[in-house]
UniProtKB/Swiss-Prot annotation:
GO biological process: pantothenate biosynthetic process
Pathway assigned in UniProt: Cofactor biosynthesis; (R)-pantothenate biosynthesis; (R)-pantoate from 3-methyl-2-oxobutanoate: step 1/2
Protein name as it appears in the record: 3-methyl-2-oxobutanoate hydroxymethyltransferase
Free-text cofactor note: Binds 1 Mg(2+) ion per subunit.
Listed cofactors: Mg(2+)
Active site: E181
Entries under Gene3D superfamilies matching the protein: Phosphoenolpyruvate-binding domains
Listed EC numbers: 2.1.2.11
Subcellular location(s) of the protein: Cytoplasm
């Protein structure tokens, strides 16, 4: 099957067609997701919580991201794979270049990093060296120790202005994609319309170009059985894994998910 590339997502944006993405951390699930129609997989540092059992993503190391990226690439050779640069692995340009190289050589097509205006120079340097970058603004889990808790973003005017400025700066720096996390849907819609690059939302309403969810949330296998309010357990009606993934893709492509119940205003 033809490999998915970044510009396939650009075509979908131009055609106003939504696409579903999901996290994966091993070859078996990556292969299953690919066979069911997922074309974009995120090897997320969320593995710190979902796989390793930590309370945040902060403890995750670059070697662990490399290991899981290799596993996912073996299971889904034709998927577009985005891999997270973990906490403090891109604190300066040299670290960002070295660690991005490691992820690309491990099988990633794109590296993802969290942050606003301060990451623009890093994105520019990576882009000029042919390393595709996905930005990530709004709720940034690596900043949990600064934020104190996982809060909805963009509810006041100053925050909304800041997030729009960050999105524009990240695009101008050369990022190819942008994740919008837990941003009120009116603002995420405005950002999506403003940018030429595709946006991928999580907890940011249905008008982003794509959606991303953590696989454990989709399959209802989270620790203590709790999932975020913006997510959905697609096995709730006693569907098996394959049917749940098919339903997730179908609801995203038809703009049935996320519903108002999974969005913030």
């Amino acid at each position: 099957m033809k490999k998915t590339n970044i510009y396939d997502l650009y075509k979908l944006k131009e055609q106003n067609k939504k696409f579903a993405s999901i996290t994966a951390y091993d070859a078996t699930f990556a292969n299953l997701f690919f066979k069911k129609g997922i074309r974009t997989i995120l090897v997320g540092d969320s593995l710190g919580m979902t796989i390793q059992g930590h309370s945040s993503t902060v403890p995750v190391k670059i070697d662990e991201m490399m290991y899981h990226t290799k596993c996912v690439r073996r299971g889904a050779p034709s998927c577009l794979i985005i891999s997270d640069l973990p906490f403090m692995s891109y604190n300066n340009i040299n670290d960002a270049l070295n660690n991005s190289k490691k992820l690309i050589q491990s099988g990633a097509n794109i590296v993802k990093l969290e942050g606003g205006l301060w990451v623009s120079d890093i994105i520019h340097e990576l882009n000029t060296r042919s390393i595709p970058v996905c930005g990530h603004i709004g709720l940034t889990p690596q900043s949990i120790n600064m934020q104190g808790s996982y809060k909805i973003q963009g509810r006041n005017n100053n925050d909304a202005i800041r997030l729009m400025e960050e999105a524009i700066s990240i695009e101008e720096s050369g990022a190819k994609l942008l994740v919008l996390e837990c941003i009120i849907q009116k603002l995420s819609n405005n950002i999506t319309k403003k940018l030429n690059i595709p946006t991928i939302g999580i907890g940011s309403g249905k008008k982003t170009d794509g959606q991303i969810l953590v696989m454990q949330d989709v399959l209802g296998i989270t620790i203590e059985g709790k999932i975020p309010s913006f997510s959905k357990n697609f096995t709730k009606n006693k569907f098996g894994i394959e049917k749940a993934i098919e339903l997730y893709i179908e609801e995203v492509e038809n703009e049935l998910f996320p519903s108002e119940n999974h969005s913030f205003n």
